[in-house]
Amino acid sequence: DVKRKWAYYVLRGRGWREGFRAVEPLVVLENAAKSLDWMWKEYENGVIELAFDSTEQLLPKWRRYRGPKSHGADLTFGEFRHALAYCNSYTQEHRPEMLTALCGVLYRNAGNSKLGQWRESFNANLMQFYGNRIHKMPDYLKWGVYAWFSSFCRFLTEGTFIIDGHEVCFAPVFSRSKREDVFDQSLGLNSIVFSVAESGVFGSVKDTDDAPLLRVLMKLLDDHNKAEALRKEMKK
């Protein structure tokens, strides 16, 4: 059914309309749907997963709401913490309201252009408000947001970012088993925000939550590298 709906959406976007051809509409949809197997991965245990592996933002706007920039460039640490919590909850329980909440966190009003803000600043006290105003977003777009954020989370723990002209990999920051799925990892983000705040690098807990996600992770990576260097030095 999902393949048929997606095929219908794609065909409509290409100008196809029922009745344009002699072939029955359902036959056209069925044939198109069969050609979309490359979009999903099917596992032996029956699990079907969308094969999406990109951090490029393909839905920068929906109506007047703006989403994150490509590669999570403008995500704050606090915004990411809350988005990840909703993403994990939806992955485990498949509750529609959790998916809506995820989209509400990520898609907000335009920011102050004079300050160079793409989106308005994230406010954790407005979580319910964010969800209420984004609830009319079509389900297929919500799934797209979920797919993008899921892919970003995987890339965050495995991929390489280019920051200030340097390649940076945050994999050492995340302790994970090879058997664990990215969503089952114990990232400990709630404890991280307090430990980073104690260092005073970004300021208070709120300041740390408002700091860019990638900058906070760079701080954690630096701490990890220093700890590893000290551990090796002590073994000599």
Feature names for model-found ranges:
Residues 1-236:
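An amphipathic, hydrophobic-aromatic interaction surface with interspersed Lys/Arg
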